[in-house]
Amino acid sequence: MAKAKFERTKPHVNIGTIGHVDHGKTTLTAAITKVLHDKFPNLNESRAFDQIDNAPEERQRGITINISHVEYQTEKRHYAHVDAPGHADYIKNMITGAAQMDGAILVVAATDGPMPQTREHVLLARQVGVPYILVALNKSDAVDDEELLELVEMEVRELLAAQEFDEDAPVVRVSALKALEGDAKWVESVTQLMDAVDESIPAPVRETDKPFLMPVEDVFTITGRGTVVTGRVERGVVNVNEEVEIVGIRQTTTKTTVTGVEMFRKLLDQGQAGDNVGLLLRGIKREDVERGQVVIKPGTTTPHTEFEGQVYILSKDEGGRHTPFFNNYRPQFYFRTTDVTGVVTLPEGTEMVMPGDNTNISVTLIQPVAMDEGLRFAIREGGRTVGAGRVVKIIK
């Protein structure tokens, strides 16, 4: 039995299963955990189908999503795998960013070929910036005709190419059900799939390698030392004595130097992505900085007031609006740590947006917000979440 020891040094990769309902996403997820458990028992728990299928509810930006998280390891990597069983859950997950993916396994039943949701999922994956897709051609045990399998494979490759994904991506013929039943040939197919995942999904850029950014959550004064801003470092690293800029919300940019980094009341040389820190800032008064601004590596992010967003609007049952909204709708847009009012312009030809819809809108904010394409936000009315979205394009 191959023994792989648990190493925290293994690269960590976030992946998920996507594809049409009933093509076997959840069964495949269960099969992967079983096959890897049998291969590396000390590294992996086996998860039964119904444990994954009964996806727990999660709240992300005020939206309830049913989503399952499983984790497993191959020899090379540690994976966190998300499976959103329902089609609506998948769409909500993609738009709200509840679980971001470094790559996805597109599950296509060989018996059906690509179906409408297959196309929709691939399109959404492109829109939200999933970097890589490879394919599990599931239920391949149920198709005897080699030509038919080749035809389905060709169709899937065309679909990937149409959305600018790698059309030479691995397409692995699997049978999740047979693998779960322990059929040796199909167990091997799942092993091959995971080898392909290891090899083809590129290693993600670590958050610490990106330029520094920290949203300001709180500001206070320490007598005799100066002003401290606290927050969770979103990306990058900040070192003591480095120059930073404070941007967003106000019209002007403030330059300053970090004279101290503190975490759990201890002084550090640096703060990095994921850390909850306090930054001591030189020459800054309490009123010079406020919640909702961001502290950044100089010149790496600019505040904007106009953008196009892709949004999901909560249905009435989800606690959203009971009525549609129209052009010039004025809700608050919650970015990172604060609400900013914005005016909505609907796409040409769209008269109104109904609760439960997903659509693209243009927004003009009354204050600038530091943003990049891909940044997530919630849409709120008086503190109640009515939708969620992501910045697709910055206009101004």
Swiss-Prot record:
Compartment(s) of residence: Cytoplasm
Reactions catalysed: GTP + H2O = GDP + phosphate + H(+)
Region (G1) residue spans: 19-26
Segments of this protein annotated with the region G4: 138-141
Keyword Nucleotide-binding tagged: yes
EC number in record: 3.6.5.3
The entry's keywords: Cytoplasm, Elongation factor, GTP-binding, Hydrolase, Magnesium, Metal-binding, Nucleotide-binding, Protein biosynthesis
A Gene Ontology molecular function term of the record: GTP binding
Annotated Mg(2+) binding sites: 26
A Gene Ontology cellular-component term: cytosol
Keyword Metal-binding: yes
Main location: cytoplasm
Region entry G2, spans: 62-66
Record-annotated tr-type G domain positions: 10-205
Annotated binding of GTP, by residue: 19-26, 83-87, 138-141
Region ranges (G5): 175-177
Region (G3): 83-86
Entry-linked InterPro entries: EF-Tu_GTP-bd, EF-Tu_GTPase, EFTu-like_2, EFTU_2, G_TR_CS, P-loop_NTPase, Small_GTP-bd, T_Tr_GTP-bd_dom
UniProt cross-references to PANTHER family, sorted A to Z: ELONGATION FACTOR TU, MITOCHONDRIAL, ELONGATION FACTOR TU-RELATED
Subunit text: Monomer.
Function: GTP hydrolase that promotes the GTP-dependent binding of aminoacyl-tRNA to the A-site of ribosomes during protein biosynthesis.
Name assigned to this protein: Elongation factor Tu
